[in-house]
Structure formats: structure tokens, C-alpha cells
Swiss-Prot record:
Primary location group: cytoplasm
Residues engaged in binding ATP: 87-94
Originating species: Vibrio vulnificus (strain YJ016)
Recorded GO CC terms: cytoplasm
Sections of the chain in a coiled coil: none
Entry-linked InterPro entries: P-loop_NTPase, PanK, PRK/URK
Catalytic activities: (R)-pantothenate + ATP = (R)-4'-phosphopantothenate + ADP + H(+)
UniProt keyword terms in alphabetical order: ATP-binding, Coenzyme A biosynthesis, Cytoplasm, Kinase, Nucleotide-binding, Transferase
Pathway(s) of this molecule: Cofactor biosynthesis; coenzyme A biosynthesis; CoA from (R)-pantothenate: step 1/5
Localization in the cell: Cytoplasm
Listed name of the protein: Pantothenate kinase
GO MF term (any one): ATP binding
Record-stated family: Belongs to the prokaryotic pantothenate kinase family.
Gene3D superfamilies: P-loop containing nucleotide triphosphate hydrolases
């Protein structure tokens, strides 16, 4: 017997329960990823019901906190509700995170929603080169997990004005910029590794993981060969866009013909991203409380909710 309840898209959409759509077409256009066509229908049928579910969880947490504060006779700032979003490279988890961030921030009871990606906790390019693991970027050993866990722990502890490193997909490195996170009501953490636990880090044993701090977790899923296809399509779009920008780490790929670019993207998938998905990301799927399963057209076709 499966630990998940399965919903078709049509059945799931009925759980919206008349919640109004607070995003415009322009909002959605700004939120979608380079390789996705996020429609209003997708937002209404999939993400509105999900935002309603998450809002109910947040309300329950806030009610519990108010009881505790009343009992203790204090008015300390309540810890944030932390949502983790995991999935493969190119599966669309960043778009999911941005849409949920926008929707949740419009609910009356928790207007302050922050989104942080784990990319900012990758080791700098120089350190990855020194350790000889540049080709393992995105694998467990390429992250400063102690720093990431400390950040999430500090957020949960209610510490103000926390700083998060900012990662650039143009320079392929950590920048000097920082993002400030100041006691949000809801924190969304998006990344390849947010559902990983001790068994995924045998090389660097520590007792606490991001997954230990999550109040709700989402895994964005699709068939591996479908994600590979999306990765190749995204690579081709980057070749004509982001890779052409000044300072781009991948500027040399702009000189490739389209066929050469396709073959290069397939090689990168085969040697790096596909292996990381199979070995380190996919095994964490069953730990999620909700799975969004996508079809070939990037649209969510099935929703699995843990009982």
C-alpha cells in the first residue's frame, strides 16, 4: 500500500475551494523559468490548491504558537514555517518555488515570505578546483552543508538580519552579493539537496540536515529521459542568451554549432547531472510530503500527497 494519496490534475484542481487567483498573466511571465511556459491554467489548477494546503498548515502552526506564547506569557517572534522544494536540474523546481512564494505572500496571515536557493551554499569555484571536484558541482560534496544547516537553524531560532551568499549562473560562482533574510513568516528553500540526510553524506558526517528543519517538503518529478530532454533544450536557449553575457563562464559554448551544442549538453547530462539525479536526488523523492509529477509538456499531471 502506497504511503501517498494520488490525485489527478482535475481532482486536485477541485481542492482550490474558490480561492481567488491573485497573480496576473504578467506576474506569471516574470516567474517562469527560461524553459517553461507557465500558464494561468497551470497556476489555477495546480498551484492555487497547493498554496491553500500550505496556508492551512501555516495557520495551524501559527495557532499552536499563539497557544504556546499565551502559556509562557511572552510575545517572542514565532519561528518561520519552512518549506523545502527538491528535484533535478532542469525539472522546474525554481519556477515552482517562485510561484508558491508569490502566492503565499498574498495570503493575509503570513505576508512575509522569503525564498532562498541552496546554490548560494556551493563552495566557491576556486575551492572546487583545489579539491578536484569541479566536475562534481551539485553533488553532496560540493556544498558547504555546515554553513547551510547553520543558516536554516538560525532562521528557525528567530535570528534577525541573516545573510545568504548569492550564486551567479553567469559566472558559475559565488558572488560578493548577499541576500538578507529577516525573520520571515514562511521560508522556502529550493535546491537539489534539501531532502538529503545523513546517509547521503558519508564523506562528511554531521548530525543535523536541512531536512530536519522542514515543516513541509515538495519534490518536483518527471521521467529521467524527459528531464534530459528539457536540460538539452534549456542548454540551447542559454547558448543564445545567458552564455553570451559578459563574464559568462560558458561563453565558449556559443561557438558551437547547434548539433555540437546538443551533443555537449547530452554529454554533460550523461557524465554529471544524470548521475547526480540517479545517485543523490531521486532516492530522496520518497521522503517528500508532496510530489508534483510532470509530463513531457512541463505540465503537472499527477499530485501525490503523503497520508
Amino acid at each position: 500500500m502506497s504511503p501517498f494519496l494520488s490525485f489527478s490534475r482535475a481532482t486536485w484542481s477541485e481542492l482550490r475551494n474558490s480561492v481567488p487567483m491573485t497573480l496576473s498573466e504578467e506576474d506569471l511571465k516574470a516567474l517562469q523559468g527560461i524553459n517553461e511556459n507557465l500558464t494561468m491554467q497551470e497556476a489555477v489548477e495546480v498551484y492555487l490548491p497547493l498554496s491553500r494546503l500550505l496556508n492551512l498548515y501555516v495557520q495551524a502552526r501559527q495557532s499552536r504558537n499563539s497557544v504556546l506564547h499565551q502559556f509562557l506569557n511572552n510575545d517572542e517572534h514565532a519561528p518561520p514555517f519552512v518549506i523545502g522544494i527538491a528535484g533535478s536540474v532542469a525539472v522546474g523546481k525554481s519556477t515552482t518555488a517562485r510561484v508558491l512564494c508569490a502566492l503565499l505572500s498574498r495570503w493575509e496571515n503570513h505576508p512575509k515570505v522569503e525564498l532562498v536557493t541552496t546554490d548560494g551554499f556551493l563552495y566557491p569555484k576556486k575551492m572546487l578546483n583545489q579539491r578536484g571536484i569541479m566536475h562534481k558541482k551539485g553533488f553532496p560534496e560540493s556544498y558547504d552543508m555546515k554553513k547551510l544547516v547553520q543558516f536554516v537553524s538560525d532562521v528557525k531560532a528567530g535570528k534577525p538580519e541573516l545573510e545568504v551568499p548569492v550564486y551567479s549562473h553567469i559566472t558559475y560562482d559565488i558572488t560578493e552579493e548577499v541576500k538578507r533574510v529577516d525573520r520571515p513568516d514562511v521560508l522556502i528553500i529550493e535546491g537539489l539537496n534539501v531532502l538529503q540526510s545523513g546517509m547521503d553524506y558519508p564523506h562528511d558526517p554531521h548530525r543535523v540536515f536541512v531536512s530536519d528543519f522542514l515543516d513541509f517538503s515538495i519534490y518536483v518529478d518527471a521521467e529521467s529521459n524527459t528531464i534530459e530532454q528539457w536540460y538539452v533544450e534549456r542548454f540551447l536557449k542559454f547558448r543564445k542568451g545567458a552564455f553570451t553575457q559578459p563574464g559568462s563562464y560558458f561563453s565558449h559554448y556559443t561557438q558551437l554549432s547547434e548539433q555540437q551544442a546538443i551533443e555537449k549538453a547530452q554529454q554533460i547530462w550523461r557524465d554529471i547531472n544524470g548521475i547526480n539525479l540517479t545517485e543523490n536526488i531521486l532516492p530522496t523523492k520518497e521522503r517528500a510530503q508532496l510530489i508534483l509529477r510532470k509530463g513531457q509538456n512541463h505540465l503537472v499531471e499527477e499530485i501525490l500527497l503523503r497520508k
